[in-house]
């Protein structure tokens, strides 16, 4: 065949099309209903009934609304569930807006420091371009939220509720990123003009003052102390006066953040299993907790998740939720749409190839709250989403085990349940993790939004 497409080639393809046994039926279905509806597999819907052999009751799902804070909502959900049970507070939520304020403030400083560190590079350098493309955003990682809580604590949602700019974050992100790009360019000029470190840092502090003002006007000034006043599910009155956010976390949440680690399943050639990885420029708190991922085989990850569920603890996880999913029905399944049968085309790719080619990446974090074990094997998983109660089964989704294999990339595991060889692998690699490039798909959850 010639390099260019010619009329003979097109005629050949048209002849093949006209001789295809299902062309007319398939084209009518797809053109009238759309590709996904025309290829939907009803049997998959039947198979994914919301019944599970292991299940943790976690109450009403939260709602991130028009924001990219899934990672934050899901992480705070894992922390609020034990609190709800212990203190008899069925509908209690931790303040996502509080952590959002400090996350954006810290990300701004993180951006400034990375701009200063790369000031000797050309603006066209890919890493510099990457930094300026999205100075800050809604996305993030488990370790990044832990860094915020370790530094600033946490408060109840009733003390620091959502605001318009938290629930619909596009205007705030646009405003902040405009300011950060302008100031970032100025910091580069100061460094390249030979200004001293003290002079550069002094100017950066003035810039951060502007950032703080933008955030305070948009989302409110976070409290330093507050009264935790509530009635429990038995209508008993309680009040805890003048408590700080860090005191509140220690007293009412108390999760051992340092003992919960991120594991990933990234079966690409550049990421050997049982090694610890980090992603360049991925973080928020300067001098705080570093993002680290221990790479596991998918069956190792599943076994640990099931063990954690059996211990009564839910699991934060990262996935590619837009793939093979139906939001309204709350289903995640690789056979949900049979596009291969509709078009008579092979779309199959390995998980590694999907990651290497950009076909798949982490774009959403949720919480695993249950699993159905049949004949010793997981068949489907119960998922707590953060899209409110309308989609799925009152906000909960059902994920097939094959979808887990294909599109689940990360899970946060209590280190206590790791076997000794994996504990050793993590401990040996955590202080000097292998650095991945900033645009690696294992960092996509933080940079996608």
From Swiss-Prot:
Q: Which InterPro entries match?
A: Papain-like_cys_pep_sf, Pept_cys_AS, Pept_his_AS, Peptidase_C1B
Main localization is cytoplasm
Q: Which GO terms describe its cellular component?
A: cytoplasm
Listed under catalytic activity are: Inactivates bleomycin B2 (a cytotoxic glycometallopeptide) by hydrolysis of a carboxyamide bond of beta-aminoalanine, but also shows general aminopeptidase activity. The specificity varies somewhat with source, but amino acid arylamides of Met, Leu and Ala are preferred
- PROSITE patterns in alphabetical order: THIOL_PROTEASE_CYS, THIOL_PROTEASE_HIS
Which Enzyme Commission numbers does its entry carry? 3.4.22.40
Question: Its GO biological process terms?
Answer: homocysteine catabolic process; proteolysis; response to toxic substance
Subunit description: Homohexamer.
Which keywords does this Swiss-Prot/TrEMBL entry list? Aminopeptidase, Cytoplasm, Hydrolase, Protease, Thiol protease
> GO molecular function terms here?
cysteine-type aminopeptidase activity; cysteine-type endopeptidase activity
Where does this protein come from, organism-wise?
Answer: Lactobacillus helveticus
Active site, renumbered:
70, 364, 385
Q: Which family does it belong to?
A: Belongs to the peptidase C1 family.
Q: Write down what this protein is called.
A: Aminopeptidase C
Keyword Cytoplasm (UniProt): yes
Task: List the taxonomic lineage.
Answer: Bacteria, Bacillati, Bacillota, Bacilli, Lactobacillales
Q: What class of enzyme is it?
A: hydrolase
Cellular localization per UniProt: Cytoplasm
């Amino acid at each position: 065949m010639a390099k260019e497409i010619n009329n003979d080639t097109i005629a050949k393809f048209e002849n093949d099309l006209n001789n295809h046994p299902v062309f007319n039926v398939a084209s009518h279905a797809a053109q009238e209903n759309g590709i996904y509806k025309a290829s939907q597999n009803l049997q998959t819907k039947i198979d994914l009934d919301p019944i599970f052999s292991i299940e943790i009751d976690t109450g009403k799902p939260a709602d991130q609304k028009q924001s990219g804070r899934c990672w934050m909502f899901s992480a705070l959900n894992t922390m609020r569930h034990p609190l709800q049970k212990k203190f008899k507070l069925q509908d209690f939520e931790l303040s996502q807006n509080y952590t959002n304020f400090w996350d954006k403030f810290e990300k701004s400083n993180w951006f400034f420091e990375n701009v200063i560190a790369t000031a000797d590079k050309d603006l066209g350098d890919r890493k510099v371009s990457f930094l300026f493309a999205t100075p800050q955003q809604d996305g993030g990682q488990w370790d990044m939220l832990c860094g915020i809580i370790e530094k600033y604590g946490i408060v109840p949602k009733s003390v620091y509720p959502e605001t318009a700019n938290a629930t619909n974050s596009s205007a705030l992100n646009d405003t902040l990123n405009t300011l950060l790009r302008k100031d970032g360019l100025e910091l580069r000029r100061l460094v390249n003009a030979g200004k001293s470190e003290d002079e550069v840092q002094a100017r950066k502090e003035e810039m951060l003052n502007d950032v703080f003002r933008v955030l305070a006007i948009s989302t409110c000034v976070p409290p330093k102390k507050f009264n935790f006043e509530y009635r429990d599910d038995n209508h008993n009155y309680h009040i805890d006066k003048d408590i700080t956010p860090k005191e509140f976390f220690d007293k009412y949440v108390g999760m051992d953040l340092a003992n919960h680690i991120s594991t990933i399943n990234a079966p690409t050639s550049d990421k050997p299993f049982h090694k610890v990885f980090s992603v360049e420029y991925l973080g928020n708190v300067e001098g705080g907790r570093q993002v680290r991922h221990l790479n596991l085989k998918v069956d190792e990850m599943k076994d640990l998740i099931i063990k954690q569920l059996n211990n009564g603890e839910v699991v934060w996880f990262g996935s590619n939720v837009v793939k093979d999913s139906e939001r309204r029905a709350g289903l995640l399944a690789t056979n949900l749409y049979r596009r291969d049968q509709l078009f008579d085309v092979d779309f199959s790719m390995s998980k590694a190839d999907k990651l290497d080619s950009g076909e798949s990446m982490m774009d959403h974090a949720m919480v695993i709250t249950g699993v159905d074990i049949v004949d010793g094997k997981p068949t489907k998983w119960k998922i707590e989403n953060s899209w409110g109660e309308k989609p799925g089964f009152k906000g909960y989704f059902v994920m097939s085990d094959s979808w887990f294999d294909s599109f689940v990339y990360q899970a946060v595991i209590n280190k206590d349940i790791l076997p000794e060889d994996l504990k050793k692998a993590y401990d040996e690699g955590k202080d000097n993790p292998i650095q991945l490039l900033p645009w690696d798909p294992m960092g996509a959850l933080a940079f996608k939004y």
